């Protein structure tokens, strides 16, 4: 369950209806921490212009979930919705570094993560969801400077930041950056990142003197 639930905005708005002024009160709530509704009857999670402090969304094993439309959240870096047999629409973009979802027509999950200082996104929508092109094709994207490529199963999958898929994939968006934290970005950082991306080694065991 969410760590904290609190009110962040209280608004009184006057609206004319048929020449009569009505006053409405709006109380917007904010969530902090992990939003874990896994295994519940939740049907949709949407953020129509509302920003929260949620850092992770967990909606796996939700049989009735059909829509995950959680975008432009400045603190949310992870989202997962696996084993949701009715998931028809997904819209995840913002500052995500780890996404795991499986639309109902995909035979395997979409697993996206990052290596370096970038973000990933995934957009997919069947007809009637009003998401994407509504053509059962998913759009994968990488955002950030010094993008090197998408890597999957030890080899490069795409040199383009954006590409389309019609089924699941496990891929890492690789970005050059200050991998060894020495205060500068050099070819050594890029080589180290690429080695980790293709599975030659992992980031914790890289000897940067030899990279």
Where are these regions (language model features)?
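Tandem repeat domain/solenoid detector
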Residues: 55-56, 63-66
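Secondary-structure capping and domain/repeat boundary segments
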Residues: 106-176
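Conserved positions within tandem-repeat grammars
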Residues: 3, 8, 29, 33, ...
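N-terminal capping/linker segments that flank leucine-rich repeat
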Residues: 1-46, 61-63, 85-129
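Short, tandemly repeated low-complexity microdomains enriched for cysteine and small residues
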Residues: 80-81, 99-105, 122-123, 153, ...
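Extracellular beta-strand-rich, repetitive "passenger/adhesive" scaffolds
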Residues: 28, 48-53, 70-75, 115
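Cellulosome-associated attachment modules in secreted, modular CAZymes
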Residues: 172-211
């Amino acid at each position: 369950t969410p760590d904290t639930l609190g009110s962040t905005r209280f608004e009184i708005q006057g609206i004319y209806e048929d020449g009569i002024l009505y006053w409405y009160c709006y109380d917007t709530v904010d969530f902090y921490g992990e939003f874990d509704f896994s295994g519940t009857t939740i049907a949709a999670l949407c953020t129509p212009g509302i920003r929260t402090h949620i850092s992770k969304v967990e909606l796996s094993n939700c049989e009735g979930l059909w829509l995950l439309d959680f975008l432009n959240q400045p603190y949310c870096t992870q989202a997962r919705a696996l084993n949701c047999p009715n998931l028809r629409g997904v819209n995840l973009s913002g500052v995500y570094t780890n996404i795991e979802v499986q639309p109902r027509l995909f035979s395997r999950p979409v697993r996206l993560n990052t290596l370096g200082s970038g973000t990933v996104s995934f957009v997919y929508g069947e007809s009637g969801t009003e998401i994407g092109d509504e053509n059962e094709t998913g759009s994968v994207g990488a955002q950030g400077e010094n993008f090197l490529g998408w890597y999957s199963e030890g080899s490069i999958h795409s040199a383009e930041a954006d590409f389309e898929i019609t089924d699941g994939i496990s891929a890492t968006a690789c970005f050059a950056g200050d991998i060894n934290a020495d205060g500068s970005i050099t070819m050594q950082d890029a080589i180290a990142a690429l080695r980790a991306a293709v599975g030659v080694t992992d980031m914790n065991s890289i000897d940067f003197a030899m990279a």
